[in-house]
């Protein structure tokens, strides 16, 4: 539940940044997806130790077993790559931040539904 709350807060923080034209909305969008993915993994008893491990374990534990669609795994990877570009790149990103945040909101909702629908812990 704590990770899902963090995901929701990151989404809430991302929206004004994106509507103001800031690429920083992507960073918050990544953290929203990151925390939601982490919640789904924790629910399955998986405790990854890094951002990269979360992406890998998400693919192994949730995408490959069919619990989530491959497009959700790709979104997590896309957001991670864009976050790196925003944080460390010198050029603006070439992405529609509003659309990414819409997809991220759906991702967070899907992970919350997954956590609520399956017994965990």
Where is each model-derived feature located?
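Terminal alpha-helical segments
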Residues: 1-121
